[in-house]
Amino acid sequence: TLSRGLGDVYKRQMSIGRTFKESMQKALRSLETGRHGFGWDGKDPAGPSREDIERKLHVPNCERIYWIKVAFEHGWSVEDLFEATQIDRWFLVHLKEIADEGANLADLDLRRAKKLGFSDKQIALARGESEDSVREKRKGVGILPTYRLVDTCAAEFEAYTPYYYSTYGDENEARNSDKKKIIILGGGPNRIGPVSYTHLRAHETESN
């Protein structure tokens, strides 16, 4: 079962994007809670009162992030949210920017929407279209994922084991190669990412 409290237990979610806004929406999707980002997925609460919002914001848990979006939609300011949650204003400012842009998601430029981390599913629901329709329109105008390099050596010397993340920028840093390629699929809650698990899966693959 999914523990919904935070407390002092170490929990994390990792995602990489060009901006915090893109990374945040990617992280929320990867939680596998049925949400497709920072809302706009048909699962936001309908007609909550101010008391409902205050109560949900008061206790840190895995649902509070979505209530921050609801609060912005109901006219709360960054300062209101800071007073209610004590979350650093830097994060709240960026979350508000997502909320402000998402309010016009149905009419938002597709490239802009993708750079903000909105999924095809979110865009489809906002526009009353199918996810496949949005994807085909996006591909038809050349809005495709690009891949950016994560420099594991901080530019001190060439990285021979870099990794990449997908985004919707203009520059693609993926290196083309004719070498034989292997895809390692990680299942379960840890998948691929934590160094120890990745290391074990890589050696397991080499031994087969």
Each predicted region: which residue ranges?
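Single conserved hydrophobic/aromatic residue that forms the stacking wall/gate
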Residues: 1-6, 10, 199, 206-208
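Feature marking long nucleic-acid-engaging regions of large polymerase/nuclease enzymes
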Residues: 11-15
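ATP-binding N-terminal substructure of ATP-dependent carboxylate-amine bond-forming enzymes
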Residues: 136-139, 145, 150-201
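Solvent-exposed alpha-helices and their adjacent loops that cap or buttress functional pockets
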Residues: 7, 61, 116, 157, ...
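Terminal amphipathic helices with adjacent charged low-complexity linkers/tails
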Residues: 18, 22-63, 69-74, 80-155
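Residue-level preference for nonpolar/small residues embedded in alpha-helices
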Residues: 63-64, 130, 188, 201
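Ordered, soluble secondary-structure elements with a strong preference for glycine-centered loop motifs
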Residues: 17-18, 196
